[in-house]
Amino acid sequence: MATIPFGYSIHPGDILKSEFMEPLGLSSYRLAKELHVSAPRVNDLVRGKRSITADTALRLSAYFGNSAQFWLNLQNKHDMWVAAKDRSLAKIKPRAKAA
C-alpha cells in the first residue's frame, strides 16, 4: 500500500480500486455484477463520488472475505478528515464548565 502523506486521507474508493480490484483484474462493471448493484454505483465509489454505506460495506465484505467494519472504518476516517478541514469548527467556543 502506498504511503499516505500526513494530513491527507485517501477515499475508500481509491483503496477499493488499487488494493482490491486492480490486483484481481476486476472492472467496476464486473464488481457491480458480483455485488448485485448497479455499475454506476461502483463506478461512483471508485471515483470518490460516493460513500461506502452499510449496505455496500456488507456486500464488499461478503465478496472480498473481510469485515464490513473494515469498509465502514475507511469511510469514517475519510469523513472525519473532510469534516475536520471545516474552518467554522475553529469558531466554536467550548461551553463553560458548571461551578
What do these predicted ranges mean?
Residues 21, 32, 61:
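The alpha-helix within a helix-turn-helix
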Residues 70-99:
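Short, charged recognition helix plus adjacent turn
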Residues 49-62:
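Short, basic-rich loop-to-helix N-cap that marks the start of a DNA-contacting helix
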Residues 1-4, 97-99:
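Intrinsically disordered, low-complexity and often Lys/Arg-enriched segments
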Residues 25-44:
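Short alpha-helical DNA-recognition segment
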Residues 2-26:
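A short, Lys/Arg-rich alpha-helix, primarily the initiator
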Residues 38, 49, 64, 75-78:
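The DNA-recognition helices of helix-turn-helix-type DNA-binding domains
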